[in-house]
Amino acid sequence: MKYQQLENLECGWKWTYLMKKHQEGELITKYIENSAAHAAVDKLIELESEPVRVLKWIEQHMNPDLSNRMKQTIRARRKRHFNAEHQHTRKKSIDLDFPVWHRLSALSQRRGNTLSETIIQLIEDAERKEKYANQMSSLKHDLEAILGKKE
């Protein structure tokens, strides 16, 4: 396993995931009968401050259809959590207008790179171009100074 599982933290994430799904109107319990489902959800709400007991609730009451989706969500959240600890693995998001994103995406695909790699290449290209322009300007200035002195 690449990332360490932290039971307390992940139980809290699972509780949050289940509550969010419940608020969105999804059936989070395996019960068809409304009263049993409401009782199970009420019990889950009480477990907010006891994250480890959430696992037992999941075993007893959770809708089995949610199992894989919840595992994937928790796995992704665990990855983001541990990646956020190190500067080089921390992810940031930026807002792009759709046409800009579309052009960047097409360029990335042509180059066979990720969006991040393509952005880095574009920045490096711009920096090299700027450095070259500065060198040419300096050479031009020096040449004008040399030619200007001889006259």
Curated annotation (Swiss-Prot):
Gene Ontology terms for molecular function: sequence-specific DNA binding
Keywords: Cell cycle, Cell division, Cytoplasm, DNA-binding
GO terms classed as biological process: cell division; regulation of DNA-templated transcription
Record GO cellular component, one term: cytoplasm
Localisation per UniProt entry: Cytoplasm
Coiled coil: none
InterPro entries with a match to the protein in the record: Arc_rbn_hlx_hlx, MatP, MatP_C, MatP_N, MatP_N_sf
NCBIfam families in UniProt: PRK05097.1
Record's subunit section: Homodimer.
Family per similarity comment: Belongs to the MatP family.
HAMAP family: MatP
Function: Required for spatial organization of the terminus region of the chromosome (Ter macrodomain) during the cell cycle. Prevents early segregation of duplicated Ter macrodomains during cell division. Binds specifically to matS, which is a 13 bp signature motif repeated within the Ter macrodomain.
Protein name according to UniProt: Macrodomain Ter protein
Biological source species: Photorhabdus laumondii subsp. laumondii (strain DSM 15139 / CIP 105565 / TT01) (Photorhabdus luminescens subsp. laumondii)
Gene that this polypeptide is encoded by: matP
